Amino acid sequence: MHSAMSFLLLFSLCFLIHCFVFLLIKKKKAKTMDAKTVPPGPKKLPIIGNLHQLGKLPHRSLRCLSNEYGPLMLMQLGSVPALVVSSADTAREVFKRHDLAFSGRPAFYVAKKLTYDYSDITLAPYGEYWREVKKILVLELLSAKKVQSFEAIRDEEVARMVNFIARSSNPVNLSRLALSLSNNVICRIAFGKISGYEDGSEAKSKFEDIFHETEDFFGTVNIADFFPALSWINKFNGVETRLKENFKKLDSFLNQVIEEHLDSRRSKTEKEDIVDALLRIQGNPNETITLSSENIKGILVTVLLGGSDTSTAVLVWTMAELMRNPMVRRKAQQEVREIIKGQGKVGESDLSRLEYLKLIIKESLRLHPPGPLLIPRETIECCTIEGYKIPAKTRVFINAAAIATDSKVWENPYAFKPERFMDKTVDFKGEDFEMLPFGAGRRGCPGMNFAVPLIGLALANLLLQFDWKLPEGMIAEDLEMEEAPGITVHKKIPLCLVASPNRCAAQD
């Protein structure tokens, strides 16, 4: 009891000292900064600044605040200054004129451990290592040719999902199936076949648990991310212990994967998987970068999390919107079934002919960007945006959700209307700033070309092979569209639907 009270007193004293120092520094900075040179923003509370205004779904809270304070807004999140960009014009200035200044990444407590000290591509600091690893990803791992080489894997896994639905009793949990599809595809592409990790095996089940736990860690807010000086609290609140346990299991699995790929007795598959490619690069003395085993594992964490999460979220949100908009769904089914008539299934080579399906995917990415705030950036140098001075080490949030629902750009922005793209050349590849589901510039998502083919292939086959209904007693207006908090925003309530086989497709 005495030791507990002593710890509480010590904690309180340390916290008060930190608060006092923070206020002194803040006051000193305020005196030297002309208020007219910084962007507008909401009033701050002592110590926490504007943290209380983030809410459970920050992209929504920040959109409301930007409506009041403007598309370029400065906030104070704990001890961290944060800039929020909420319009296409402001995003264009950031990415076109100041992309280098905005190319940094903030330090995150959990990410440092789970990415092997930022050995990944997503959160690595801007610099030589990041440039070389991005080059590897773009040229070796995620090039158009490489993505195309994995077409058979995507085709097989989509067929397995379709067969599972056909055998299942209704309703089917499409959220769970989409996650399983994405996980299976990314694991086969990244690792090939790992002994002992067959479907239904205990080892695979444990890996999936590790994978989901790792995702949860990345999506959880940590006090150290807003008060870096208080990172020591994680030693006492259980976070560091749980983080170490998760990392130990993740590291053990990745070590097994690498060791098996290095085993000379391992049978070689027809296609080089991502681990094979990274080990080949590691062993090439002519490469400009020498990859360590830790670097390889950090890159694999990026590939695993980014590749699976995005595809799952987009596929589920798209199907949910189709269920809420039956006329759109019927039009999409009609297109798929007319064009694919006689084939029995949709192949990737068919996707280019499915024009309406492309519009549906665009509209889904506009209305439900998988990462609505993108991955936060950090300024690496001072710059001026729209006449406002932005200091170095400012955290930057690009509110892709707000940009893509801006009523000044989009008519009836919250309606799901694929037809809006019939007379618009706007795309999602980072060149058009009216919608930025994959970001833009140097730090744009390199895995975009990896996710989109799987989403299109899965969606087209679901529409070809089945007629879809909501569970008995539900109508379109009853379908919940609430978002779950996280870096990637998933549908909070699983999407459960009734699937009836399309007999014409089965006969084909």
UniProtKB/Swiss-Prot annotation:
Compartments in which it is found: Membrane
Gene Ontology biological-process annotations: alkaloid biosynthetic process
Gene name of the encoded protein: 11H
Record's protein name: Strychnine-11-hydroxylase
Membrane disposition: Single-pass membrane protein
MF-aspect GO terms: heme binding; iron ion binding; monooxygenase activity; oxidoreductase activity, acting on paired donors, with incorporation or reduction of molecular oxygen
Keywords recorded for this protein, A-Z: Heme, Iron, Membrane, Metal-binding, Monooxygenase, Oxidoreductase, Transmembrane, Transmembrane helix
Pfam families given in the database record: p450
GO cellular component, one term: membrane
